[in-house]
From Swiss-Prot:
UniProt keyword list: Cell outer membrane, Lipoprotein, Membrane, Palmitate, Signal
Taxonomy, superkingdom: Bacteria
Keyword Lipoprotein annotated: yes
Official protein name in the record: Lipopeptide
Topology term for the membrane: Lipid-anchor
Organism: Pseudomonas aeruginosa (strain ATCC 15692 / DSM 22644 / CIP 104116 / JCM 14847 / LMG 12228 / 1C / PRS 101 / PAO1)
Principal localisation: membrane
Signal peptide feature range: 1-20
Upper taxonomic lineage: Bacteria, Pseudomonadati, Pseudomonadota, Gammaproteobacteria, Pseudomonadales
Lipidation (N-palmitoyl cysteine): C21
Amino acid sequence: MKRLFLSFVALALLAGSIAACGQKGPLYLPDDEKAKKEHSKDRYGF
């Protein structure tokens, strides 16, 4: 029973850490073409 509980806790922590990944910052839609070009790629240029 203890092993099952520890497995569940480990799975929950793993899922939480994966869900926390992603871009940070405000979400918005750029209004003009210049802003669209500047922000079309992510921060690291991939």
